[in-house]
A protein has these predicted regions:
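A Rossmann-like FAD-binding core segment of flavoenzymes
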Residues: 1-6, 10-13, 21, 100-194
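Residues forming the flavin
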Residues: 21, 78-80, 87-88, 95, ...
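FAD-site-proximal beta/loop scaffold in flavoenzymes
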Residues: 43-71, 166-231
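FAD-binding core/adjacent interface of flavoenzyme oxidoreductases
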Residues: 1-94, 101-105, 172
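Residues at the starts of beta-strands that form the adenosine-phosphate
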Residues: 76, 109-113, 210
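Amphipathic alpha-helical segments in well-structured domains
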Residues: 61, 92-96, 129, 228-231
Length: 231
């Protein structure tokens, strides 16, 4: 069973089976949700399977692999990096590097286009840039300050705030993220309705006494990225 709702005033949690349990202390790890509606056209394109995110492991992970395998040699794979903070800071750069490695071996005419909404690589920048230069030059192209604002799943087109639209063959679009639904619905995601603010000495919510929030749903502190070793 699992929790479907939290009442921080009554100090109860509701389960999927309909039962309600009281708590004295609640430790909550609600994870993240993807804000598909923040990019025009993405929700529909994702629902149809035309544009995958594969940021939550599951069917989309397998689906993205199949799309890459089916892509003709000479095609372009477009991956974006959302504005920080987001789950697993090095993740998009790792994924781009892995796909570039696959292309180098099996589709050498293909290209990885990595579009970053941030001004620079957000994690391990020197390491990634060094590998891209030494191992994937001509295969992986990195462009900073490229915030995706819209997509067209049918034409495989990506749109931006200022730059001209770009077309690709496989689009892997990652929207902005926020704390999981439980945190939002219960009011615990109190920072811009996105992240949970906590006391970093105890991880107790600043708006819900006796509720301790851990993991990616917490607003990041300096030197505390949204990554596994911190969660």
């Amino acid at each position: 069973d699992y929790v479907t709702a939290i009442d921080v005033e009554k100090r109860t949690v509701k389960l999927k089976n309909g039962k309600t349990l009281p708590y004295d202390k609640l430790v909550l790890s609600p994870g993240i949700d993807l804000q598909l509606d923040k990019i025009e056209g993405l929700a529909a394109a994702n629902a149809s399977g035309q544009i995958l995110q594969a940021w939550k492991a599951g069917p989309e992970t397998v689906g993205l692999r199949k799309q890459l395998e089916a892509m003709p040699d000479g095609g372009t794979y477009i991956l974006n990096v959302p504005l920080a903070p987001y789950r697993c800071p090095p993740g998009p750069y790792e994924r781009a590097s892995m796909v570039a490695n696959y292309f180098k071996q099996y589709k050498p005419k293909s290209k990885v286009l990595l579009l970053d909404a941030n001004a620079d690589v957000t994690s391990k920048g020197k390491l990634f840039k060094g590998v891209w230069e030494s191992e994937y030059k001509g295969i992986l192209e990195y462009r900073p300050n490229m915030k995706v604002t819209g997509v067209d799943g049918a034409t495989k087109t990506v749109r931006f705030e200022f730059e001209e639209p770009i077309k690709g063959d496989v689009l892997n679009i990652l929207p902005d993220q926020r704390a999981g639904k439980l945190a939002v619905d219960s009011g615990i995601a109190n920072l811009n309705n996105r992240w949970a603010e906590v006391n970093y000495m105890t991880f107790e919510s600043t708006v819900a006494p006796n509720v301790h929030v851990i993991g990616d749903s917490v607003q990041g502190a300096p030197l505390m990225p949204k990554s596994g070793h911190m969660a």
